[in-house]
Amino acid sequence: VSIDQYLREQFPTGAFTPLNKTEDLDVLVAGCGTGQIAIASAQKYLGARVLALDLSLASLCYAKRGAPDDVAARIEYAQADILKLAPLERKFDVIDSSGVLHHMADPFEGWRILLSLLRPGGLMHIGLYSEAGRRDVWEARKFIAEHGLGSTPDEIRRCRQKLLETPLASLTRFTDFFTTSECRDLLFHVQEARLSIPLIKAFIINHKLRFIGFEFGRPSLQQYRNHFAASGWAWPDLDRWHSFEVENPSTFSGMYQFWIQKP
């Protein structure tokens, strides 16, 4: 489908200006990891030409090997640091950066650099960790520090066992908890910023961006749509979303996943 059709399906009441592009859609995936988002972008959006960047050469090699034949020719891979992309002369219609910016000392610095690469009227999908949604993760990190637990495979197994004996057994809602490498990233990552809807809103206002809406899986999406409609709330109302998250802190336990548009 076109990027416009995809967004209309996700956000029937969301306001955005259509790109009206079904070919030569330049997409940047900033922090492609294993390549899933780059592949999905190439498969999902009509006419997508994807540049997939990552700091890790190992991740890039893995991503390139995993690209299906039907989209491999439309995905270009390159090693790069987001914080050093400002001089890049290429501009993009769509930028996707999910699960990356919150691992920077200043996530908003990285976000600003990505905005500079987005064409006027361009669309951006961002994924950021929620402080409220990951409160038990922060508590687990305190627990780990207090007990002097390390991040070797044996220590991670011991750590998980100890956590299961406490109220922090709630961490089992994260599938990452059960895999050693992913659990290391979940509980032992050395750099992780804490973000909130008011902080995101302030950035959006300061940069005159249009907030289109939060993205959810289908069951949750319909549930939230019904709740907002019954309450008479507008879907892009960030103040309402903040109030909703305060009352329902697990709403964004994965990440804030949302779309914005540059003026």
Label the predicted regions.
Residues 123-167:
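Conserved class I S-adenosyl-L-methionine
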Residues 165-263:
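Rossmann-like AdoMet/SAM-dependent catalytic core
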Residues 56:
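Conserved SAM/SAH-binding beta-strand->alpha-helix loop
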Residues 108-120:
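A short glycine-rich, Lys/Arg-flanked "PGG" loop and its adjoining helix->strand segment in the class I
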